[in-house]
Amino acid sequence: MIGLIQRVKWAKVEVEGQTVGEITQGLLVLLGVEQGDDQAKADKLLEKVLNYRVFSDEQGKMNLNVQQAGGSLLVVSQFTLAADTNKGLRPSFSRGAAPQEANALYEYFHQQAARKIHTQTGQFAADMQVSLQNDGPVTFWLQI
């Protein structure tokens, strides 16, 4: 399971011109589900996302996690994170989980996150437009 996290001042996701998820300060989490992923991996990734210290403290050091910084999560599914780009000029998505399995784990990740922190989401398998203002920029690839 892959989480590409970006520290943001704000982020929102739209589907067909309608905002379906929006946060102010926090983390945009682009979530990629791979074959073999399960709820245990989702739990482990969520704990890492929630505890990863990417927000600055009073001395300007990255010592605070999203909860300590008073932030939120915007979780957006992104199957392209599971792409294999090693061969040729077209990505292969053979490592990605089947859509039904990926959706179930995406929803599970969202539900578990929402129990711990204010969380918004995109819409699984939709054509989404994601807007954000990076803060830093600060971006990390987390893989479980």
Curated annotation (Swiss-Prot):
InterPro entries: Daa-tRNA_deacyls_DTD (IPR003732), DTD-like_sf (IPR023509). It catalyses: glycyl-tRNA(Ala) + H2O = tRNA(Ala) + glycine + H(+); a D-aminoacyl-tRNA + H2O = a tRNA + a D-alpha-amino acid + H(+). Its main location: cytoplasm. The keyword tRNA-binding applies. Keywords: Cytoplasm, Hydrolase, RNA-binding, tRNA-binding. CDD domains: Dtyr_deacylase (cd00563). SUPFAM superfamilies: DTD-like. An aminoacyl-tRNA editing enzyme that deacylates mischarged D-aminoacyl-tRNAs. Also deacylates mischarged glycyl-tRNA(Ala), protecting cells against glycine mischarging by AlaRS. Acts via tRNA-based rather than protein-based catalysis; rejects L-amino acids rather than detecting D-amino acids in the active site. By recycling D-aminoacyl-tRNA to D-amino acids and free tRNA molecules, this enzyme counteracts the toxicity associated with the formation of D-aminoacyl-tRNA entities in vivo and helps enforce protein L-homochirality. PANTHER family: D-AMINOACYL-TRNA DEACYLASE 1, D-TYROSYL-TRNA TYR DEACYLASE. This is D-aminoacyl-tRNA deacylase.
